[in-house]
Every structure is written in C-alpha cells, then in structure tokens.
C-alpha cells in the first residue's frame, strides 16, 4: 500500500486508496466480479466435499495416466526433472519434422477439443494436456482418445494403445 501512495503512474485496478475508502462504509468503488465470487464459492464447496487429499491424489493419478499414454505412443513427455512431473498437465513432444500446433488445430477442428500449446521456444514442438480441476476418469480417457485419433489423422508416427495404457493405470 505504501508504494501506491507515492506512485504517479495512472492506474485503475491497483488504486487501493479508493478501495480502502469505500470499504469503510461496506462498499466497493467499482463493479465487483460477483460471478467470479459465486464460482469460487461453488469450487470451494466441491473441493471441500471431495477433500483436499483426494483432489491432490486424483490429479497425480491422472498425470500418471497421461504419461503412460504418451509412453505407449512412443512420444516423449517434456519435463527437465522426471521425478517432478506436473500433476496439473502433461507436455508431450511431437517428433522432429511435425508441427504440434497443426496437430492441435486438427484436433480442435475434428473433435472440438482444445489442447495447450508449447510456450516460447517450444511452440509447435509440443502440446499440453491439462488434467486438473473439475475433471474425471472418463473426461481424461476422452481427451487421450482424441489425441490418439489426432495423431493418426495427422500422420504423426506413434504406437497405438495409449488410451489402454492410461486406463490400466487408473482402473
């Protein structure tokens, strides 16, 4: 707050003095993002109902399943430290000479399924599969099936059986 008191640059979002003044009367100086607050309330209810330990375990299980699929496809997962794979997403590299963004576009067009892109220097070299939040086993299997079908349609060299390998890790 001290930094904003002396700041001379124009600002709106970080104008804390207006927020503090309005809060004295129980108000807020701008239109609050009430829909975000309602969404947060529901998300917290869901989190508490499942239990934090169960949520963390589910995300880790889904990460293992996604990596099992990539391994079965013969594709490399991108993680500098293999013991520190993310429970939130799995980054999968496509073989040299193939474009991950073209694969993503094909999958989006054919199956209406969105995959994450590689960021920075990895753009076009890998795609990212998210497996966190409101996500269950069937959603993951559908995602992996969409990827496997997309790999086939795009002519990207891979082995079949990624979905089966993933199922074996979570059934």
Model-derived features: where do they sit?
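Short amphipathic alpha-helical segments
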Residues: 24, 86-90, 125-128
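A common structural junction motif
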Residues: 107-115, 148-151
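General structural feature for long, well-ordered alpha-helical segments within catalytic domains
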Residues: 36-39, 43, 55-58, 62-66, ...
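Flexible, glycine/charged-enriched surface loops at secondary-structure junctions
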Residues: 51-58, 72-81, 118-119, 154-164
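Conserved PLP-binding catalytic core of the aspartate aminotransferase-like
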Residues: 76-110
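Short, glycine/charged-rich beta-strand-loop motifs at protein surfaces that mediate ligand recognition
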Residues: 89-94, 115-117, 130-137
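PLP-dependent enzyme catalytic core of the Aspartate aminotransferase-like
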Residues: 121, 125-171
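Active-site C-terminal subdomain of aminotransferase-like
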Residues: 1-72
């Amino acid at each position: 707050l001290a930094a904003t008191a002396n700041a001379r640059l124009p600002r709106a979002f970080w104008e804390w003095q207006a927020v503090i003044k309005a809060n004295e009367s129980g108000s807020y100086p701008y239109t609050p993002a009430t829909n975000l607050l309602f969404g947060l309330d529901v998300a917290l209810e869901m989190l508490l109902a499942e239990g934090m330990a169960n949520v963390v375990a589910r995300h880790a299980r889904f990460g293992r399943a996604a990596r099992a699929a990539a391994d079965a496809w013969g594709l490399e997962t991108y993680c500098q430290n293999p013991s520190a794979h993310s429970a939130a997403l799995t980054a999968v590299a496509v073989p040299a000479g193939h474009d991950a963004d073209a694969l993503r576009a094909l999958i989006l067009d054919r199956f209406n399924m969105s995959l994450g892109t590689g960021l920075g220097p990895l753009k076009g070299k890998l795609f990212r599969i998210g497996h966190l939040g409101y996500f269950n086993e069937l959603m993951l299997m559908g995602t992996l099936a969409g990827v496997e079908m997309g790999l086939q349609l795009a002519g990207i060299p891979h082995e079949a059986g990624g979905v089966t390998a993933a199922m074996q890790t979570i059934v």
